[in-house]
Design a protein with these regions (language model features):
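Short, positively charged and aromatic/hydrophobic N-terminal segments
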Residues: 5, 11-12
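Acidic, serine/threonine-rich low-complexity disordered tracts
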Residues: 34-165, 203-298
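Positively charged n-region of N-terminal signal peptides that target proteins for export
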Residues: 16-19
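Compositionally biased non-globular segments, especially hydrophobic aliphatic-rich helices
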Residues: 11, 22-23
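Hydrophobic membrane-insertion alpha-helices, especially the h-region
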Residues: 23-36
Length: 298
């Protein structure tokens, strides 16, 4: 399968396809990373509220002066970026298509304030299995604000996470009903936005990083190990990449049932740090998502 990215046997095949899609999507909750740099903290306004009855000489109503918002300028991902992936399953000599996944990043207006929105859309089995996720992160890119997932299959469900960065809480709803509250940390990301946070880090040297991630049931320090540089082939093209291996210890879902599960991610070794390949190995087989189409604003 050719890629257009440009750098700067088992018993139940349908169950395996579904596991492939859920496995690739679940890995987003794994991509663990990092406490925020201090300069990305909350911006404070120097506006001072006047005393009652006080009037300014220029007669302007300065009580309406808005708070200054600093919008994070990404180093690697881009506003308007879209990546389309083809997912396949491998077991022994057998290979078969398992589904499609699309990631996107966009700057939006969220309740009158600038925010970052990240989306994931996946499908398999001719549309019988669908998974949509949407993450909203504050303008400074320091904390998640909302996280929505809609899963349609035999176990269809709708999950909403509402983050309160000031109170350091996350409220979870399942199919419209309250489903618990958990504590978070000063800089906490959801299972989808953490993959974009990860791309922003300095991965030039091997090492290990950690960051707070909340899935609505728990907040945990998730770790990722930078293995080093590798060259991979997608279709007939070779790419220079950086291989990273997230720790699956806290990941829920298909990985939680397999202690030997392993996740590997290859990022482009260039200014984009695009996710070129995702590989998950569980007891059912190996699932691989390769970047097939990459769109980025000039």
């Amino acid at each position: 399968m050719p890629s257009v990215y440009k750098g700067a046997g088992w018993r139940h095949p349908e169950a395996m396809k579904r596991a492939a899609l859920i496995g690739i999507i679940s890995l987003a909750g794994l991509l663990s990373l990092w406490l925020l740099l201090a300069w990305l903290g909350k911006t404070e306004s120097n506006y001072r509220q006047p005393r009652p009855g006080m009037r300014f000489e220029n007669k302007e109503d300065k009580a309406s002066v808005p708070e200054t918002i600093v919008v994070y300028q990404p180093r690697h991902f881009a506003d308007g970026e879209v990546g389309h992936y083809q997912v396949r399953m491998e077991k022994g000599f057998l290979k078969m298509p398992a589904g499609k996944v699309t990631f996107a990043a966009q700057q939006i207006d969220h309740n009158g304030t600038t925010a970052w929105q990240f989306t994931l859309k996946g499908g398999a089995l001719g549309g019988l299995v669908q998974y949509d996720a949407r993450s909203i992160v504050n303008a400074q890119f320091t904390h998640s604000l909302e996280y929505h997932t809609v899963q349609k299959d035999l176990a269809s469900r709708n999950i909403v996470l509402q983050f309160d960065p000031q109170q350091q809480r996350c409220r979870r709803q399942l199919n419209g009903n309250p489903d618990g509250v958990v504590d978070t940390e000063p800089s906490t990301f959801d299972p989808l936005s953490i993959i974009f946070k990860f791309r922003e880090l300095n991965l030039a040297r091997p090492g290990e990083f950690a960051s707070a991630v909340c899935d609505g049931k728990a907040t945990f320090q998730s770790k990722v190990r930078v293995v080093g540089r590798e060259e991979i082939q997608i279709g007939d093209k070779n790419y220079k990449t950086i291989l990273v291996e997230p720790d699956l210890g806290q990941l829920r879902g298909v990985f939680q049932k397999d202690p030997d599960a392993k996740l590997q991610i290859w990022l482009s070794d260039d200014s984009h740090r695009a996710v070129l390949r995702i590989r998950t190995k569980v007891k059912h087989g190996t699932f691989i998502a390769d970047l097939a189409d990459y769109q980025r604003p000039e």
